[in-house]
Amino acid sequence: MQKIAKQALSSLSSLAKSPANAMGSISHLPAYGHRLLPVLIDEISRDEPDRVLFYTPRNGQPSQGYDEVTTKIFANAIDRLCGWLDSQLGSPTVSKTIAYIGQNDLRYFIIMIASTKLGHRLLLSSPRNSVEGHVSLIKQSGCELWIASSGLGHHEFLQDLHIPSVEAPELSELLDPTLAKPYIYQKSWHEGKSDVLALLHTSGSTGLPKLVPVYLETAATVDGFHLMEPTDGKRPTGVEWTGTRQLCAMPLFHVAGICLGLYSAVFFNWIVVLPSVGPIMQHVIEDALDHISLDSAFISPSVLQDISKSSRVLEKLSKLKFITSAGGPIPQSVGDLIHPRVPIMQTMGMTEGQWLASVVMHPDEWAYYYFHPRTGVEMRPYSEDLFELVFVQNPKLSATQPVFKTFPDLDIWETKDLYSRHPKHPDLWKYEMRRDDLIILSNGEKFNPLAAEGKLISHPWIAAAYLTGRGRFQTAALIYPDDSSFNNSDDTIIDNIWPTFEEVNKSLPAFAQIHRDFVKIVRTPFPCTPKGTLARNETEKSFNADINAIYDRSTHGKPSVHINGTTEDVVRSGIREAIETVSGLVDLKDDDNIFTRGFDSLHVIRLAGLLSSAFYQPLEVEPGTIYTNPTISQLSHSVWTHLEYGPQDRIHHSEVTLEMLAKYIQAFEPPRESKEHIVLTGTTGEIGSYLLDDICKNDKVAKVWCLNRSVDAFQRQVDSAKSKGLSSNWQSKAKFVRYDVTSENLGLSQDDLEEIKNEATAIIHNAWEVNFNLPLSSFDPQFVGLQGLVDVCRATRHKIRFFFVSSISAAMNWPSDLLGPVPEASISRFDAPINGYGSSKLVAEHLLSKAARSGVLSLSVLRVGQVAGPVRTLGEGSIWTRRDWVPAIIDASVHLRALPLDLGSASILDWIPIDLLAEVIGQLVVPVNPVVGQENYYNLLNPRTPSWKDTLPGLKAHLEASFSEKFEIIPLQEWINRMRGAEKTIVKEVSEGSSETARRAQSGLKLLAFFETLASETEGSRGLEWSKANALAQSSILACMEPVSSAWFDTWLTQWGY
């Protein structure tokens, strides 16, 4: 125990010193998961005063440059606001609830910490809330003061509620570096963990918003990401991205903005770049990309949807290392356009559960999540193909389960979020929908509308799509057109987009398909949640008249403005009228910024559409034009210039040029090596025979050198292939070469050696002594042969891709209860092998790893599990060899007329048939998408794992039909005892030659000690799990492999003559 404790302390010390976890010059060991934000901010401001937390755009405009906000300035701003709050509320002798609503800037984070320091509760009500929503939250929270940034303070409902309102200090005032009066938060962890950081609220998508308190303890669970062990070498995203400079283009009052804005800067040492003020749209991202260097950007799916339609912005986005998104699923069509240009990393969060720890995925799996095991989530079946994400409280995971800080009385919290499992990787999950997103038609049929909506919005004329039909006989669609098509007639738009509907209908079940008569164009944007996703229930209510119109075959019109563009003054007057029409703003001055007066993204879209149809000559006013010209004077001048001189097409010309470059650039890339030349050792063995057959069928393989020790290997190979039903038509590719591990240059002739050195591209080392009883010292000849192959690699013209067929026995003693699943990585514990054979494989892995790291070769280690008999090849010799332990159990069971109820610790059947294993290895050796890296490890086990009990009924039925006798099913230990009791009878019958079943059962007697070992460990007692992500990613055959089944057992039993 003392040794374990010392190791644990050593690990903690290493963790504290590692760059990914270090907090600058702070010398003490951080209490990750128990750090109070107000204390931590003051601490790092003292110890690291010059560390940059944020970049904020000067005067809210990136074009004016950015101001650095260091820890010292941030902490000082918090103290300054504490003083201001004191002046408004008096000394904090009594905790009060205050509300803040403001421009999307750093003041949100400043007031959160300041109110917490003073013991007050801060309500953050979304600016998008309806009056009814604001009033409900004020009443729920007991709000006593409404604070707003300039231009957002006047709300009539506050007077009705007798709630005073006050304007917040400007951000520039708060960031003044002049030292403010310090306000010290002196509470310990236990004293302060229940203090409220902020009162957030649900989206209100299913009714009025409900309060969700975020406690300091809740925030600290995100800090607990530091405590999570790496998974396949990756830490949770927050820790993995330490030190990155990321644009946080999210609303800062929302949990997504708080997590990836405030928490990421303070807990994880990110440098967070805040967006320009105003609605977060495509131009906000582009402004930041144009004016500050970034590593990444955090962008909502709705904005990514707009970006995907602009080749100009996509080109700028491609300069980032990656982009992050959250708040909802990215439509497949949008992600498919973006991820070839820049990797997409999705994160998942929720108001009640903050930031859900996930691990960085391969860019090709951008649509999926890998949730870290320490989140304590379970995926519970909901319907045939859908699973619900459910949090299950686990006291051991207290520091990393925020949802149970929000709901401390719950043991289980159902998120109502539904996911589908990755078809190849069982631990990857794709978000599909909310439970209440399902549409149930009047005939009881139900379907998921989100995938269809995602395909629809891929059309450039569609900005948003909403499918409906709850309680109706037919699905209907509301379409909100994109800016580019907004001023077209409904019929024109439907004509243009209908081919996309036809494609969508192909993916929908017949009962859910959309008829042309059930499509309606709407000119008002759909209601959205604060995170930018479609608010389905609110949309259903808000567009009830339009929905009824579809079914009633009625239509509606829209307002219009007409502008005679003869002079710039006339244009200015018309634009003023248009702004008044869409927003109701009647007292605007020509130089007033419309966004500081309450203009939002919905107003922009309506104004753009209105102006695009307002003139007597063709004109398209894009939303971006309004954002970059936010005053009447600026907008009228831009429109007048367009009318007078025509559009400037330089940007369009640039986009066309880039598209032409992209079209032809691949033709000018250097050609890749098209054919493989492979050295394969041990082809006459069981695996080797099937492997030779598979790789010789591959058109990408030009030549195979078959290295065997026997002088008659060729004839043996031909006989084996014919017997097994394999092709022997490989002579044109295969060359048989005898080799000797004890001789110089492996005993190869000079011609053969030179040929291999000049032509070989890969080596598959399959030959190895298979004997589980030998000690490690007996495997010296194997290591001498391995050294000879590595020496060959040193002299080859091509860098050899070396595939070593290893074994899971190299890690069967892996302590998975302490270290988790056996990784697809180098095994550093030399007590992991189960026997001398496994030790020899582990030593070989390490020797080859040394060669790979020295640049001699690139290594792929293939850890093979239980190899079962073939299931596809039907030759007479195509049989599961009776020397194996599974056939031995069957032969013994036939003699006893009894089958064991379980196989003890081997009851989980992760077996791979030998012919399918050869195909899996073939995919790894000749991959569709080559893997980059000096070392790759693959655990080759069947990803689908039934138990022995699952196959037992079919096995029993087959044997009973074959022998016309009943077979018992008895516990494994009883079965072993019966075998021991039958030993004398079996030996006697074998000696007399009177019983074939006794002769076969004799092999079971030889393995009784092994069976005793299985019985001593009950089913699942070992708890050994194997990571398979790498293998599943590279082999579609393994990923789609069927589980061991009764049908497979029927094949094997037939092979054995039963």
From Swiss-Prot:
This is Non-canonical non-ribosomal peptide synthetase FUB8. Disulfide bonds: none annotated. One of its GO terms (molecular function) is transferase activity. The modification O-(pantetheine 4'-phosphoryl)serine is found at S601. Residues 566-643 form the Carrier domain. Residues 43-365 are annotated as: Adenylation (A) domain. InterPro entries: ACP-like_sf, Adenylate-forming_Reductase, AMP-binding_CS, AMP-dep_synth/lig_dom, ANL_N_sf, Far_NAD-bd, NAD(P)-bd_dom_sf, PP-bd_ACP. Non-canonical non-ribosomal peptide synthetase; part of the gene cluster that mediates the biosynthesis of fusaric acid, a mycotoxin with low to moderate toxicity to animals and humans, but with high phytotoxic properties. L-aspartate is suggested as fusaric acid amino acid precursor that is activated and further processed to O-acetyl-L-homoserine by cluster enzymes aspartate kinase FUB3 and homoserine O-acetyltransferase FUB5, as well as enzymes of the primary metabolism. Its EC number is 2.3.1.-. Gene3D superfamilies: ACP-like, N-terminal domain of ligase-like, NAD(P)-binding Rossmann-like Domain. Pathway: Mycotoxin biosynthesis. It comes from the Eukaryota. Fusaric acid is phytotoxic to plants such as cotton and banana. It has been shown to induce programmed cell death in plants. In addition to a mild toxicity to animals, fusaric acid exhibits acanthamoebicidal, antioomycete, and antimycobacterial activities. Contains three distinct domains: an adenylation (A) domain that activates the substrate amino acid which is subsequently covalently linked as a thioester (aminoacyl-S-PCP) to the 4'-phosphopantetheine prosthetic group of the second domain, the peptidyl carrier protein (PCP) domain, as well as a thioester reductase (TR) release domain. Pfam families: AMP-binding (PF00501), AMP-binding_C_3 (PF23562), NAD_binding_4 (PF07993), PP-binding (PF00550). Keywords: Multifunctional enzyme, NADP, Oxidoreductase, Phosphopantetheine, Phosphoprotein, Transferase. Induction: Expression is positively regulated by the fusaric acid cluster specific transcription factor FUB10. Expression is also positively regulated by the secondary metabolism regulator LAE1. Residues 680-921 are annotated as: Thioester reductase (TR) domain. SUPFAM superfamilies: Acetyl-CoA synthetase-like, ACP-like, NAD(P)-binding Rossmann-fold domains.
